[in-house]
């Protein structure tokens, strides 16, 4: 946006639009102001023909240069087919309709944290991926708003407060022409499904792998379960008994041995496992409330014989969800269990062991700071022990050299006395 139009043309366009200078680059507000001023300056409405012509010229040049900002970076490899100027009237919100805000940010509390690595296919995460690809493929060291439309470039340009940034950024992208964002609309509607191996290796437990929550039971429609997993399509299906085995309350790994261990029957007593099957517990989690019986079985035999119908995936509501990031009440901190000392444990190994035992009790946002502090303490302990070892070796070497010098001096004195006799 800093290279769009000259400084004089910028000031003139903002003067005609009657907007302050800090709104330069906000395409939605500028377009709304352009429509209002067009009604006032139109010759048929009693306006000035010269001012109307000047406004149309500057506004058309502005849109053309914004369109060419990313095109001037070179081939990016992920751009979709570009439209002509006639197709710029189709905004992002018009493309996705009433469900734009759900498509914009699939899981606000998760997408805001996953800055570098995310398999989500919402608009927010896709624009962040474009930022990384533009820097890598186009060798663009510094990107500004217009060349990139990600959240970080938006915040850097406007300096938006953190608590309001999500809604303001959503409104900013909503009025932007979908053609300028280089988004594959099909990937937003139909996100790619991850392979079973990647889903099993995931370290974050999603709804699809941790059973049914009370919220899902209350919001599901048509006796269906709503499952949301980042990067995979969350499809509402009618519940069947096999779905309970694939959605246990615990994260488990299936193996075959004897005797069998009934892990899930403590939560779902109606589930019957075969005798040669055992479920090995990987990481215990808090059990969810038991699923209501009316959601476990169909209401009639006719409903049970109907084929499975896939409904449109569900998304978390975005409005006011980001406000929950800062809780009003103090969250109680759990005290980690005491550490049992072991023989032969170095100081830095003890620090790392203490940090690993606290990993399940500290908040997620403090994990990085805690790991940095542990790393620094481990380095200090390691450097001190290495310094002591080096000092001990030096003292041993000096003692050996002194003893060797004393022996040589003694031999020299004995040889000298023997010659006198």
From Swiss-Prot:
Coiled-coil segments: none
Domain J: start-end pairs: 12-75
Compositionally biased tracts (Polar residues): 215-235
Localisation: Host membrane
Transmembrane regions listed in the UniProt entry: 395-415
InterPro entries: DnaJ_domain, J_dom_sf, Papo_T_antigen, Papo_T_antigensf
Region listing for Disordered, in residue ranges: 215-237
Protein name as annotated: Middle T antigen
Its membrane topology: Single-pass membrane protein
Lineage: Viruses, Monodnaviria, Shotokuvirae, Cossaviricota, Papovaviricetes
Keywords assigned by UniProt, alphabetized: Early protein, Host membrane, Host-virus interaction, Membrane, Oncogene, Phosphoprotein, Transmembrane, Transmembrane helix
Modified residues (Phosphotyrosine): 250, 315, 322
Post-translational note: Tyrosine-phosphorylated on three residues 250, 315 and 322, providing docking sites for host Shc1, p85, and Plcg1, respectively.
Residues bearing PTM Phosphoserine: 257
GO cellular component annotations of the record: host cell membrane; membrane
């Amino acid at each position: 946006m800093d290279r769009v139009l000259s400084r004089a043309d910028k000031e003139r366009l903002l003067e005609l639009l009657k907007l302050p200078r800090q709104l330069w680059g906000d395409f939605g507000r500028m377009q709304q102001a352009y429509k209002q001023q067009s009604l006032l300056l139109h010759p048929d409405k009693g306006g000035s023909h010269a001012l109307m012509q000047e406004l149309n010229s500057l506004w058309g040049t502005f849109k053309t240069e914004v369109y060419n900002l990313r095109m001037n970076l070179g081939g990016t490899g992920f751009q979709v087919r570009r439209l002509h100027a006639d197709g710029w009237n189709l905004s992002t919100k018009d493309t996705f309709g009433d469900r734009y805000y759900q498509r914009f940010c699939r899981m606000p509390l998760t997408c805001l944290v996953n800055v570098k690595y995310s398999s989500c296919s919402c608009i927010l995460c896709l624009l962040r991926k474009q930022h990384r690809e533009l820097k890598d493929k186009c060798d663009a060291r510094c990107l500004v708003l217009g060349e990139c439309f990600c959240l970080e470039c938006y915040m850097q340009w406007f300096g938006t407060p953190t608590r309001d940034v999500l809604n303001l950024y959503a409104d900013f992208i909503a009025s932007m022409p979908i053609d300028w964002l280089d988004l594959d609309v099909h990937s937003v509607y139909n996100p790619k499904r991850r392979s079973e191996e990647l889903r099993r290796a995931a370290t974050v437990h999603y709804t699809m792998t941790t059973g049914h929550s009370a919220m899902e039971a209350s919001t599901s429609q048509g006796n269906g379960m709503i499952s949301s997993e980042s990067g995979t399509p969350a499809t509402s299906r009618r519940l069947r008994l096999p779905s309970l085995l694939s959605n246990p309350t615990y994260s488990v790994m299936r193996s075959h041995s004897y005797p069998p261990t009934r892990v899930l029957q403590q939560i779902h007593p109606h589930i019957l496992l075969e005798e040669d099957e055992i479920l090995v517990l990987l990481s215990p989690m808090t059990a969810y409330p038991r699923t209501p019986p009316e959601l476990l079985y169909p209401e009639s035999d006719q409903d049970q014989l109907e084929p499975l119908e896939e409904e449109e995936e569900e998304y978390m509501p975005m409005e006011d969800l980001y406000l929950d990031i800062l809780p009003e009440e103090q969250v109680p901190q759990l005290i980690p269990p005491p550490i049992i000392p072991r023989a032969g444990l170095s100081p830095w190994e003890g620090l790392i062991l203490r940090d690993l035992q606290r990993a399940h009790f500290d908040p997620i946002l403090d994990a990085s700071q805690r790991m940095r502090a542990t790393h620094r303490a481990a380095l200090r302990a390691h450097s001190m022990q290495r310094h002591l070892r080096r000092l001990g070796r030096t003292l041993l070497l000096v003692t050996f050299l002194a003893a060797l010098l004393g022996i040589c001096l003694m031999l020299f004195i004995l040889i000298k006395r023997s010659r006198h006799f």
